[in-house]
C-alpha cells in the first residue's frame, strides 16, 4: 500500500537566523518540486519579490511552481484549506514546509499534526529543521530558552553565516549544540544554497523507511562507539569540556539499546508512567521498538503527552532485533532519564 500522505517539514530558528534566506532558496529552486510554505505573516516572511509569479490575499504563487500562504485562523484550518484547493485543482503541492515564528515552541505544532484527524490521515511529519545563526548563536542560546529547545528537538541543524565567524568559534558552537542534541546532524550553509535535498526525508515515520533511514533518524548518522555505554551505570564519554550555560542545564537527554524484544505490556506501562509523571516536560521521544512475538520493529515518536500511531517498518533486515529509544526532556537530568529507561532493561528478558 502506497503512503500518499503529504510530508511536512517544520522549520524553526530565531529572528535573524536565516530562515527567510533558506525559504527563498527553496522557493526559487525548480528542482525542489511543488512545495507549499506556510508562514505566520506575509509581511514578516520577506519573500523575494523577483520570485513571485502572482499573489492574492491568501496565497503567493512563485515562479518555480511553489506557493506560500499565511496562517488564517489556526494551523489545522490553514492546512485543510490548502488540501481543499488542491482537490479543486486550484493549486498543486507535493510537500509542506511550516515556518515557525522565532519564539515559537515547536511542540504544540507537532501535536496539532498528530491529534487532528484530517491532518493525521493526510500528512506525515518529515522532519524538524532548526536554523542557528553562527555569528549570534551563543548569545541567543544564552538568552532564550526557546532557542535551546528548538536545537534540542531538531533532526537537522543548519548553521548559517558561517563565513562571518572563525573556525574555532564554529566548532565550539557545534559542541554546544551536540551537547544539547547528541544525535543531530549539523551542516553549514551560506545564503541557504545547496540544501534542498538535505531538508527532506529526515524522518522514519513511514513504513517504507529503510533500516539505515530509521537508524539515522533515531541515533544519528555518525554515532560514536562507546564499548561500555550500553551497560547500566556507564555513560558515553563527554565531548569537549565547556562551562554549561544555565539554559542548557535544563535540557536532559538519554538513550538505551535493548538487545532483545520486550513485552508490549512492559513498554506500555513504562510509557504511561513516564507521561503521567512528567509528560509536559518531554520534548521528544523517538525510537525503534521490537515487541515480543512480532518480527518487524515499530518506529515510535511523541511530544509531551501526544504520540504518533506506531509505524511498522517493512524493510528491516532480519537478525538485528535491538530496540533503540531516545528521550529529550526539559528539567529532567540525564541520570533521571537513564534510570527511567533502565526499567525497560529490567524487564527485557521476562
Label each residue range with its predicted role.
Residues 2, 149, 156, 165-323, ...:
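C-terminal accessory "lid"/substrate-recognition subdomains
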Residues 2-140:
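Nucleotide-state-sensitive switch-loop elements of NTP-binding domains
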Residues 11, 38, 133, 160-161, ...:
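A secondary-structure boundary/capping signal
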Residues 36-38, 92-97, 121-132, 151-162, ...:
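Conserved beta-strand/loop subsegment of P-loop NTPase cores
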Residues 39, 71, 98, 161, ...:
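Small/polar loops that bind or transfer phosphate-bearing groups
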Residues 51, 120-121, 148-149, 316-317:
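Short secondary-structure boundary/capping segments
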Residues 88, 120, 146-149, 246:
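Structural motif
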Residues 108-112, 134-147, 151, 159, ...:
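Non-catalytic interfacial helical region
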Amino acid at each position: 500500500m502506497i503512503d500518499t500522505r503529504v510530508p511536512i517539514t517544520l522549520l524553526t530558528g530565531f529572528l535573524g537566523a536565516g530562515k527567510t534566506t533558506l525559504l527563498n532558496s527553496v522557493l526559487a529552486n525548480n528542482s525542489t518540486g511543488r512545495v507549499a510554505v506556510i508562514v505566520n505573516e506575509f509581511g514578516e516572511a520577506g519573500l523575494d519579490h523577483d520570485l513571485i509569479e502572482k499573489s492574492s490575499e491568501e496565497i503567493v504563487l512563485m515562479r518555480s511552481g511553489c506557493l506560500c500562504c499565511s496562517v488564517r485562523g489556526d494551523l489545522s484550518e490553514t492546512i485543510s484549506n490548502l488540501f481543499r484547493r488542491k482537490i479543486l485543482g486550484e493549486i498543486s503541492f507535493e510537500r509542506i514546509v511550516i515556518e515557525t515564528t522565532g519564539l515559537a515552541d515547536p511542540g504544540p505544532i507537532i501535536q496539532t499534526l498528530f491529534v487532528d484527524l484530517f491532518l493525521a490521515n493526510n500528512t506525515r511529519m518529515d522532519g524538524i529543521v532548526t536554523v542557528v545563526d553562527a555569528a549570534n548563536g551563543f548569545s541567543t542560546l544564552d538568552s532564550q530558552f526557546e532557542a535551546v529547545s528548538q536545537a534540542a528537538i531538531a533532526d537537522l541543524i543548519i548553521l548559517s553565516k558561517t563565513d562571518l565567524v572563525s573556525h574555532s568559534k564554529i566548532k565550539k558552537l557545534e559542541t554546544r549544540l551536540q551537547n544539547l542534541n547528541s544525535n543531530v546532524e549539523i551542516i553549514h550553509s551560506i545564503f541557504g544554497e545547496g540544501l534542498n535535498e538535505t531538508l527532506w526525508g529526515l524522518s522514519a515515520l513511514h513504513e517504507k523507511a529503510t533500516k539505515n533511514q530509521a537508524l539515522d533518524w533515531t541515533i544519528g548518522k555518525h554515532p560514536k562507539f562507546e564499548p561500555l555505554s550500553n551497560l547500566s551505570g556507564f555513560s558515553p564519554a563527554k565531548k569537549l569540556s565547556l562551562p554549561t550555560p544555565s539554559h542548557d542545564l535544563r535540557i536532559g537527554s538519554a538513550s538505551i539499546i535493548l538487545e532483545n524484544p520486550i513485552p508490549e505490556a512492559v513498554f506500555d506501562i513504562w510509557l504511561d508512567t513516564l507521561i503521567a509523571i512528567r509528560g509536559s516536560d518531554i520534548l521528544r521521544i523517538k525510537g525503534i521498538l521490537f515487541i515480543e512475538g512480532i518480527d518487524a520493529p515499530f518506529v515510535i515518536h511523541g511530544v509531551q503527552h501526544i504520540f504518533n500511531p506506531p509505524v511498522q517498518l517493512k524493510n528491516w533486515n532480519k537478525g538485528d532485533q535491538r530496540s533503540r529509544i531516545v528521550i529529550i526532556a526539559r528539567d529532567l537530568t540525564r541520570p533521571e532519564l537513564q534510570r527511567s529507561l533502565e526499567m525497560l532493561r529490567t524487564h527485557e528478558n521476562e
